[in-house]
Amino acid sequence: MHWPRHMAWRYSFLRCTARSNGTVCHIKKGLIAAERDQSALRQARLDWITHRQPRMRAEPHRLVFIDETAVKTNFTRLRGRAPVGERLYGTAPFGKWGTQTFIVGLTQNALIAPWVINGAMNGPAFDTYIETQLAPALDPGTVVILDNLSTHKSPRAAKALKERSCWFLFLPAYSPDLNPIEMAFSKLKAHLRRIGARTFDALLQALGDICNLFDP
């Protein structure tokens, strides 16, 4: 059932104010790593923000941010409209569904070198991605920025970039918030939930269509 916009806004407002004191509303809590409180990590993040980021803004055409994220064939919309006091239900596969890993690069104007594997990312898969997908798509002098994970610290992958006159630059530990590709993934998953692909082939098609339409 579809509700008029003014009614939908009223329901959303009432959900918030019903559990508030007039100035504070109960909302979902975000979590950050407790390890960020360590002095060495605080300094590393400060150095990144005050020294590296200004240089990045001066030469954005040289940057590619990469990361991986899980994509599933049971994605569905998580929110909708309903009268106050009534639950809202939807349908999604609870039994047979698949989880894949999607890895891609974010430039200043596009998503490049998208790649999907079944299961979790590991060292050999990451090496293959860099060698066969990402490195051939890079211009000489490109800096590839990524999370500080052991899987990413591969001599084989670094060699593949070096052969293209490119190199890795690792983010401070526990700092995914410093990688703008996280915002791209948020948009991408919102589209996937809207599309609701239920097979691997349909998921691949949806990811390709989204990447082609993406505008950072």
Label each region the model flagged:
Residues 1-216:
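Short functional hotspots at interaction and active-site rims
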